């Protein structure tokens, strides 16, 4: 493609958001609105320019991209004024692609087509047909040729009946853009410089104005308040879920699935309702996730079964593992193949060996547990002394009886056994049985008189 400059307008405060953050930093599926736009243009353009205003330092710090040219719009005097602030940095022999930081679902493929149209005609608009066009600038045509764009507040009653509207997104030869920006004025109800007025200038100049009518109205929707943001989130999530399903992922209900990050998966994977994926998550083949689970930054192997109401964060789960229900696996945990983690178990910063079972009501923290170990119900690794965390090591084949406490730092040897109800404060050697209990007393029961 020719020399392409992206101009992203991101100066608005977003008053209706009622937020200390500027509108373009509101979050949609784990990324800011502006980051969504940038992700679609970064491979299309030679240079990206962002016109910023409200809380500009906050915006720049969040994006943190030194290759972007940041241009301050001191006064918000309209879209034409915003673009004019950027023009000193635009090369004449180029195409300017103009976008908005609060229109986050625009597709790269649409922008690619728009640029191609511009290379043929010099100007190309992106429009959309809406059943209810209220609030949008109308596309005015004469014999199918675009003549102007009229904003809602300046439109006549006849023009208000038009349902083809301007999305604001356009591509234009940069020399023409500079020329027509010098020809527009602020004689309108808003007293602003409308970027859309350059279309009337081009039509008067007998220029052919091309257009693409978006087939997907959702990709050109803007965001003005938290209600619209939530609506757009649902549209984004459903569209993403459908794409996953087309790639082979089984989703019980695509409207009740959220991926706020990236998800890769093998064949025959099934995810039930109300599952949230965050960060980078990878699923192997034939893995199932049942309802109400949260999976974050985790690698999950083949043939893993995750039962309802589990939270798994920053972990590695080996092949054939079963987890849940009601399990919390915290960061830096590695569960090796065919281990079983049962209901109401919490594991933190630990390695759980092959074929090991932790079936009920246990806490395991800062521990290394070998293979073929059985951890009974209610076992606690007491890893914190009030100041420091300490490690528990349990070797292969050990058996830890129910309701035992292991006071770290401690090591339980290979094939050792801990009797139920014990509090173990000293390490136990290989093949030893350790029991720590007070002597049982059976006292005569005295009934009340």
Swiss-Prot record:
Species whose genome carries this gene: Vesicomyosocius okutanii subsp. Calyptogena okutanii (strain HA)
GO molecular function (one): glucosamine-1-phosphate N-acetyltransferase activity
EC number from the UniProt entry: 2.7.7.23, 2.3.1.157
Name of this chain's protein: Bifunctional protein GlmU
Keyword Metal-binding in annotation: yes
The reaction(s) this protein catalyses: alpha-D-glucosamine 1-phosphate + acetyl-CoA = N-acetyl-alpha-D-glucosamine 1-phosphate + CoA + H(+); N-acetyl-alpha-D-glucosamine 1-phosphate + UTP + H(+) = UDP-N-acetyl-alpha-D-glucosamine + diphosphate
Pfam families, A to Z: Hexapep, NTP_transf_3
Pathway the protein takes part in: Nucleotide-sugar biosynthesis; UDP-N-acetyl-alpha-D-glucosamine biosynthesis; N-acetyl-alpha-D-glucosamine 1-phosphate from alpha-D-glucosamine 6-phosphate (route II): step 2/2; Nucleotide-sugar biosynthesis; UDP-N-acetyl-alpha-D-glucosamine biosynthesis; UDP-N-acetyl-alpha-D-glucosamine from N-acetyl-alpha-D-glucosamine 1-phosphate: step 1/1; Bacterial outer membrane biogenesis; LPS lipid A biosynthesis
Co-factor binding comment: Binds 1 Mg(2+) ion per subunit.
Chain positions recorded as Mg(2+) binding sites: 102, 224
Region: Pyrophosphorylase, residue numbers: 1-226
Cellular component aspect of the GO annotation: cytoplasm; membrane
């Amino acid at each position: 493609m020719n020399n392409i400059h992206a101009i992203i307008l991101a100066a608005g405060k977003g008053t209706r958001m009622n937020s200390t953050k500027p509108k373009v930093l509101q979050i949609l599926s784990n990324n800011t609105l502006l980051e969504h736009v940038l992700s679609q243009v970064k491979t299309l353009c030679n240079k990206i320019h962002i016109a910023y205003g409200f809380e500009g330092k906050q915006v720049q710090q969040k994006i943190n991209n030194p290759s972007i040219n940041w241009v301050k719009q001191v006064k918000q005097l309209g879209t034409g004024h915003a673009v004019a602030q950027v023009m000193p940095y635009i090369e004449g022999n180029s195409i300017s692609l103009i976008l908005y930081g609060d229109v986050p679902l625009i597709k790269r493929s649409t922008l690619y087509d728009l640029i191609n149209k511009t290379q043929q005609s010099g100007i190309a608009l992106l429009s959309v047909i809406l059943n209810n066009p209220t609030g949008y600038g109308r596309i005015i045509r004469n014999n199918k040729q675009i003549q102007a764009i009229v904003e809602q507040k300046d439109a006549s009653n006849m023009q208000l009946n038009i349902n083809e509207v301007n999305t604001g997104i356009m591509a234009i030869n940069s020399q023409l853009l500079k020329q027509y920006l010098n020809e527009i004025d602020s004689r309108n109800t808003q007293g602003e410089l409308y970027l859309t007025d350059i279309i009337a200038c081009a039509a008067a100049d007998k220029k052919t104005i091309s257009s693409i009518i978006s087939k997907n109205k959702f990709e050109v929707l803007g965001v003005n308040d938290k209600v619209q943001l939530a609506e757009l989130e649902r549209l984004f999530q459903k569209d993403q879920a459908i794409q996953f399903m087309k790639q082979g992922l089984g989703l019980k209900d695509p409207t009740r699935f959220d991926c706020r990050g990236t998800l890769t998966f093998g064949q025959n994977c099934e995810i039930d309702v109300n599952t949230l994926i965050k960060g980078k998550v990878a699923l192997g083949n034939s893995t199932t996730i049942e309802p109400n689970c949260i999976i974050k930054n985790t690698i999950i192997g083949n043939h893993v079964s995750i039962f309802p109401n589990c939270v798994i964060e920053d972990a590695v789960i080996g092949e054939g593992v079963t987890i849940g229900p009601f399990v919390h696996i915290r960061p830096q945990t590695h569960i090796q193949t065919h281990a079983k983690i049962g209901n109401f178990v919490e594991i933190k910063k630990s390695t759980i060996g092959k074929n090991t079972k932790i079936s009920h009501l246990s806490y395991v923290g800062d521990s290394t547990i070998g293979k073929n170990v059985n951890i009974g119900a209610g076992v606690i690794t007491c890893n914190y002394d009030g100041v420091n965390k300490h490690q528990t090591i349990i070797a292969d084949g050990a058996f830890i009886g129910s309701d035992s406490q292991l006071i770290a730092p401690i090591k339980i040897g290979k094939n050792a056994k801990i009797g139920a109800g014990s509090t173990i404060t000293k390490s136990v050697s290989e093949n030893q049985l350790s029991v720590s209990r007070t002597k049982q007393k059976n006292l005569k029961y005295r009934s009340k008189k």
